[in-house]
Amino acid sequence: MIVIADTGPLNYLVLIGAVDVLQPLYKRVIVPQAVVQELDDAAAPAAVRTWIAQPPVWLELRPDPPSDPTLDFLDAGEKAALTLAESLNADELLIDEQTGRAEAERRHLRVTGTLGVLANAHLAGLRDFDQSLARLRSTNFRLHPDVERLVRRRIAAAKKES
């Protein structure tokens, strides 16, 4: 499985102490250099900068792909992550920002955000969704109530199927 991550999901998963769910869920996660730079930026939280300074073995750092000028409306990390996901024919792109998600979906990429990762971790028995969500709310993560309802319905439906 090829999974590419943008800055947002990694940032929030580090902040809530749940970044370790990525390895059992996806085995390996690939990030472009632009995402590494955003995670290591002076404006990034100290915990995030510390984490990316010594990335786990399952996090594969890649050079940025050639720039796609049609994506100049996105920030550098989103643009590089989306372009890398396209170039590698990724199975999934981890991205939170709505404009980037919409563009990725328009390009027929499968997207999952921080909340989706937490839902998958819950369904895999790795984390309690409500506890993870409470931690996420203690950050500056913006969560629309409709999105939360949708994810909760997805969790309930998946539990019924199993």
PLM feature segments, named:
Residues 109, 113-155:
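Hydrophobic alpha-helical interaction segments
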Residues 98-99, 116:
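Short, ordered loop/turn segments at secondary-structure junctions
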Residues 18, 100, 125-128:
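Short phosphate-engaging motifs
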Residues 1-92, 98, 105-109, 146-162:
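Active-site-proximal, substrate-binding regions of enzyme catalytic domains
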